């Protein structure tokens, strides 16, 4: 923070580090930093913080050592939201069981990029975990890096069967992914690329009562 207006000097001081809650939800609008304001967000070196950000308490003091940790809060919250938005049902019961299926099978399609890996680390380390996670991508280098960051043998210690699959090398990706699932299909599928072929594959590998999130 470089300069603080008189109305906020009791809480903020020049030199303080901060991060933002960008989902303002101000009076029902979709306004957000980087898209909706001329002098706020994006690649600006200096910003003027709009009054609504202060009104909503969305300017947050940051006391961490690494800036990247603060910058990951928003994208990770999006992936966490996707896990929480998933739901499943039981026959004859008209209620939704929110969240991914505990002990189920999870596929993260086109998932070896930054957002997919964020979803993977959350799936591996949260309280409610699947029994199987399959991460697909077309880029072998990214898959190899993902496997080095999240070794399947480490996941196995927590009872999770972890697979990294290059669908670009498969003649029939859907058939192979279904085979990996044991023929049941997947309880939860997260699609991390806005590519028609990936979306189609995501739908095709769903199991009974499966939940598909078009994340990208």
PLM segments and residue spans:
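Glycine-rich beta-strand-centered segment in the early N-terminal region that forms part
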Residues: 1-24, 40-41, 60
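NAD(P)H dinucleotide-binding glycine-rich loop of Rossmann-like/cofactor-binding domains
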Residues: 21-103
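Glycine-rich Rossmann-fold phosphate-binding loop(s) that bind the pyrophosphate
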Residues: 75, 110-113
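ADP-ribose/adenylate-binding Rossmann-like module
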Residues: 188, 204-216
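Adenosine-nucleotide cofactor-binding segment
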Residues: 102-104, 109, 120-199
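Generic structural signal for buried aliphatic residues
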Residues: 18-19, 106, 212
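Hydrophobic/small residue at the entry helix of a nucleotide-binding pocket
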Residues: 78, 114-115, 142
